[in-house]
């Protein structure tokens, strides 16, 4: 019998995770299958316990379940997931323990590293202060990065920066309002956009234009629909290096795969599968 893995969320119909993980299982000759399941927050604990009872191999969680999962008594979060305040990967232990992890920030970090972006000593600007910004900023702060979080509502950026600072991580984190973005970018090495600006169908919007950017900057947009956002086009026009949001999706999935199976997945195949799905 195939071992089942899955992703819980609501909505979930357009998830690319099943195609990505099933391609990896098939390539490795593993008798496993990955499905998407629509689960509402109030049913999450029952769904997780049901998956455990049925012998699922592991789970991913997506919107709007990541924060809900951390509050469940049945899940033991790892220290970083607890600090972030969100879980996106569930591992069922052999002793009955259900462990929660957050691979989003690690996925973003690896997307940058595997695009030959120099991280050490870099000044990083993160736009947005939602769940994705939180995961990424916590991960990079744990690695000692200098980060400025910029958000339209300055108070949210400052609050997130305080949360990260209170976690006693080695990085230096501050929060600013959107009006200061242009000046911050002049001294920045990396810009990470975690807002939905530029996402389909609002494809003509961007957090910054070419005149705000420069050739010594790396611009990473976690939006991957469309594949090339307006921000990435503006970055190319300025001479900046660009990193696609597809890579974060793939690498966070690859980290989850390793947590479940202990096996290194075929990352290039996973990336190819996602790109093909997005181009249909």
From Swiss-Prot:
<feature type="binding site">
    <location>
        <position position="222"/>
    </location>
    <ligand>
        <name>NADP(+)</name>
    </ligand>
</feature>
<comment type="pathway">
    <text>Metabolic intermediate biosynthesis; chorismate biosynthesis; chorismate from D-erythrose 4-phosphate and phosphoenolpyruvate: step 4/7.</text>
</comment>
<feature type="binding site">
    <location>
        <position position="245"/>
    </location>
    <ligand>
        <name>NADP(+)</name>
    </ligand>
</feature>
<feature type="binding site">
    <location>
        <begin position="128"/>
        <end position="132"/>
    </location>
    <ligand>
        <name>NADP(+)</name>
    </ligand>
</feature>
<feature type="binding site">
    <location>
        <position position="88"/>
    </location>
    <ligand>
        <name>shikimate</name>
    </ligand>
</feature>
<dbReference type="GO" id="GO:0004764">
    <property type="term" value="F:shikimate 3-dehydrogenase (NADP+) activity"/>
</dbReference>
<feature type="binding site">
    <location>
        <position position="104"/>
    </location>
    <ligand>
        <name>shikimate</name>
    </ligand>
</feature>
<dbReference type="InterPro" id="IPR036291">
    <property type="entry name" value="NAD(P)-bd_dom_sf"/>
</dbReference>
<dbReference type="InterPro" id="IPR041121">
    <property type="entry name" value="SDH_C"/>
</dbReference>
<dbReference type="InterPro" id="IPR011342">
    <property type="entry name" value="Shikimate_DH"/>
</dbReference>
<dbReference type="InterPro" id="IPR046346">
    <property type="entry name" value="Aminoacid_DH-like_N_sf"/>
</dbReference>
<dbReference type="GO" id="GO:0009073">
    <property type="term" value="P:aromatic amino acid family biosynthetic process"/>
</dbReference>
<feature type="binding site">
    <location>
        <position position="224"/>
    </location>
    <ligand>
        <name>shikimate</name>
    </ligand>
</feature>
<dbReference type="Pfam" id="PF18317">
    <property type="entry name" value="SDH_C"/>
</dbReference>
<protein>
    <recommendedName>
        <fullName>Shikimate dehydrogenase (NADP(+))</fullName>
        <ecNumber>1.1.1.25</ecNumber>
    </recommendedName>
</protein>
<comment type="similarity">
    <text>Belongs to the shikimate dehydrogenase family.</text>
</comment>
<dbReference type="GO" id="GO:0009423">
    <property type="term" value="P:chorismate biosynthetic process"/>
</dbReference>
<dbReference type="Pfam" id="PF08501">
    <property type="entry name" value="Shikimate_dh_N"/>
</dbReference>
<feature type="binding site">
    <location>
        <begin position="151"/>
        <end position="156"/>
    </location>
    <ligand>
        <name>NADP(+)</name>
    </ligand>
</feature>
<comment type="function">
    <text>Involved in the biosynthesis of the chorismate, which leads to the biosynthesis of aromatic amino acids. Catalyzes the reversible NADPH linked reduction of 3-dehydroshikimate (DHSA) to yield shikimate (SA).</text>
</comment>
<dbReference type="Pfam" id="PF01488">
    <property type="entry name" value="Shikimate_DH"/>
</dbReference>
<keyword id="KW-0057">Aromatic amino acid biosynthesis</keyword>
<keyword id="KW-0521">NADP</keyword>
<feature type="binding site">
    <location>
        <position position="62"/>
    </location>
    <ligand>
        <name>shikimate</name>
    </ligand>
</feature>
<dbReference type="InterPro" id="IPR013708">
    <property type="entry name" value="Shikimate_DH-bd_N"/>
</dbReference>
<feature type="active site" description="Proton acceptor">
    <location>
        <position position="66"/>
    </location>
</feature>
<keyword id="KW-0028">Amino-acid biosynthesis</keyword>
<dbReference type="InterPro" id="IPR006151">
    <property type="entry name" value="Shikm_DH/Glu-tRNA_Rdtase"/>
</dbReference>
<comment type="subunit">
    <text>Homodimer.</text>
</comment>
<dbReference type="GO" id="GO:0019632">
    <property type="term" value="P:shikimate metabolic process"/>
</dbReference>
<dbReference type="InterPro" id="IPR022893">
    <property type="entry name" value="Shikimate_DH_fam"/>
</dbReference>
<keyword id="KW-0560">Oxidoreductase</keyword>
<dbReference type="GO" id="GO:0008652">
    <property type="term" value="P:amino acid biosynthetic process"/>
</dbReference>
<feature type="binding site">
    <location>
        <begin position="15"/>
        <end position="17"/>
    </location>
    <ligand>
        <name>shikimate</name>
    </ligand>
</feature>
<dbReference type="GO" id="GO:0050661">
    <property type="term" value="F:NADP binding"/>
</dbReference>
């Amino acid at each position: 019998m195939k071992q089942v893995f899955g992703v819980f969320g609501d909505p979930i119909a357009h998830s690319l995770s099943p195609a990505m993980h099933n391609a990896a299982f098939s390539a490795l000759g593993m008798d496993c299958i990955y499905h998407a399941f629509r689960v509402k927050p109030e049913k999450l604990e029952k769904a997780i316990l049901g998956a455990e009872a049925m012998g699922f191999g592991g789970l991913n969680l997506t919107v709007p379940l990541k924060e809900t999962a951390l509050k469940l008594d049945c899940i033991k979060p790892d220290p970083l997931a607890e600090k972030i305040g969100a879980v996106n990967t569930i591992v069922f232990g052999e002793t009955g323990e259900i462990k929660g992890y957050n691979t989003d920030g690690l996925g973003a970090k690896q997307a940058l590293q595997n695009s030959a972006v120099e991280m050490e000593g870099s000044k990083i600007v993160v736009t947005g202060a939602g769940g994705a910004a939180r995961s990424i900023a916590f991960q990079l702060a744990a690695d000692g990065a200098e980060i400025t979080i910029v958000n339209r509502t300055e108070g949210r950026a400052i609050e997130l920066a305080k949360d990260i600072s209170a976690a006693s991580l080695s990085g230096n984190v501050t929060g600013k309002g959107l009006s200061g973005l242009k000046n911050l970018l002049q001294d920045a090495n990396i810009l990470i956009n975690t807002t939905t600006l530029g996402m389909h169908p609002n494809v003509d919007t961007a957090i910054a234009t070419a005149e705000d950017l420069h050739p010594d900057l790396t611009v990473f947009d976690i939006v991957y629909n469309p594949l090339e956002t307006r921000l990435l086009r503006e970055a190319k026009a300025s001479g900046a290096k660009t990193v696609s949001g597809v890579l974060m999706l793939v690498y966070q999935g690859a980290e989850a795969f390793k947590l479940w199976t202990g096996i290194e997945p075929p990352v290039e195949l996973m990336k190819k599968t996602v790109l093909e799905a997005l181009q249909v």
